[in-house]
Amino acid sequence: MLEVGIGTGLNLPLYPGHCRITGIDLSEEMLEKAQEKVVELALNNVTLKAMDATVMDFGDDEFDSAVATYTISAVPDPVGVLREMRRVVKPGGGIVVLNHFRSHRPVVGRIEDLVAPVCTRLGWKSNLPLEPLLQQVGLAPEIDTKVNLFNGWRLIKCVNRK
């Protein structure tokens, strides 16, 4: 399992013990906190690496699956990140994204567009549209589940059909 944008390792306790995890992040400071969590929880199945998710230092089809939580709308090149995730995941493997995407509801979508400049300065895109993003990468959602009250955050699971 590859976790892209592992940050401080918030998800690490959620993975089953038999699952080998490779976590990457661009931020050394975040990785230091994740490493503390690895040591604290005695997670021998976790490897952490500093890496740009748009140019991953992994071979093609190296992972069974990949996940990115709260990452895709916070990176400068979400298409590049998803392309790389697709490249390193084996055919038939899962690509899971938990993220905020632009709402399909017209009023909410317009509000997200209006606040987008402020959100961008804060480090994330409030109006990132899901469907065009996935189409550019050649992915289609098998599962698309809304995960909060306002339906802006969605759990997307795609099967890598190369």
Name what the model sees in each region:
Residues 2-55:
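Class I SAM-dependent methyltransferase SAM/SAH-binding core
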Residues 20, 92-94:
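Short glycine-centered segments of the SAM/dcSAM-binding site in methyltransferase folds
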Residues 23, 48, 64-67, 97:
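Conserved SAM-binding loop
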Residues 51-66:
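A short acidic, Gly/Pro-enriched loop at the edge of an enzyme's catalytic core
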Residues 64-77:
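A short SAM/SAH-binding and catalytic strip from SAM-dependent methyltransferases
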Residues 79-91:
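A short glycine-rich, Lys/Arg-flanked "PGG" loop and its adjoining helix->strand segment in the class I
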Residues 96-154:
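C-terminal alpha-helical "lid/dimerization" subdomain adjacent to the S-adenosyl-L-methionine
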Residues 155-162:
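C-terminal lobe and adjacent flexible extensions of AdoMet/dcAdoMet transferase-like proteins
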